[in-house]
Amino acid sequence: MNRIIPPENLPELLERAHMMAGVSLAQIAAQRGLNVPKDLKRDKGWVGQLIEMELGATAGSKPEQDFLHLGVELKTIPIDSQGRPLETTYVCVAPLSNIQGLTWQNSLVCHKLQRVLWVPVEGERHIPVGERRIGTPILWEPDPQELQLLQQDWEEIMELIALGKVEKLTARHGEVLQLRPKAANSKALTQSIAEDGSLKMTNPRGFYLKTSFTAMILNKVFG
């Protein structure tokens, strides 16, 4: 399978993304010589990885934007027949220790969400994975109000992490951004700050965008 060369510039990336609109996942997988999974229970990241590969994304699992040279993060978003997001959107792993001096401006969440290429994909479970079609891509940059909401949630969540209250944080915290356990395996552990300031072990957490927020982004474009 030939590796796709990363796009040289933003117009080239957008052209590639627009060329995928209306195409099924099975068609793209066939071009790349890949098998389509029967369902996504064990292959949750398969759709995102397929789109990343087809567009020539470079980051893989590294903590940086997918198209670092273009300043663009790629996010696939499963939608229903009404164009509404079906699930929250993973942004990045949340730091639970060594967070002194970390600010919103130098956080990975801020870096990743500076400019996002959203690629909607049909996600309703009754549609076989291979038959699901890719939608029209959206290049999004948060406006001042969206940035303020993101920053506010991030700062409140990070303050609770710094106070050792990570266990008290639930998915209900935050208007647009939430913190949730990240690992598929609940035995995975990482260091976090305890309430007395020492370090303790806990499950890794990730930052996720709530569906109400991503629905707002899609609505602005598609109405």
From Swiss-Prot:
Record-linked SUPFAM superfamilies: Restriction endonuclease-like (SSF52980)
Ordered alphabetically, the record's keywords are: Cytoplasm, DNA damage, DNA repair, Endonuclease, Hydrolase, Nuclease
Localisation per UniProt entry: Cytoplasm
GO molecular function: any one? endonuclease activity
GO annotation terms (biological process): DNA modification; mismatch repair
Coarse class of the primary localization is cytoplasm
A Gene Ontology term for the protein's cellular component: cytoplasm
> InterPro entries recorded for this chain?
DNA_mismatch_repair_MutH, DNA_rep_MutH/RE_typeII_Sau3AI, DNA_rep_MutH/T2_RE_sf, Restrct_endonuc-II-like
Q: Which residues form a coiled coil?
A: none
**Stated family:** Belongs to the MutH family.
Cited function: Sequence-specific endonuclease that cleaves unmethylated GATC sequences. It is involved in DNA mismatch repair.
* UniProt cross-references to NCBIfam families, sorted A to Z: mutH_TIGR (TIGR02248), PRK05070.1 (NF003458)
Give the protein's recorded name.
DNA mismatch repair protein MutH
* Organism expressing this protein natively: Shewanella baltica (strain OS195)
Taxonomic classification: Bacteria, Pseudomonadati, Pseudomonadota, Gammaproteobacteria, Alteromonadales
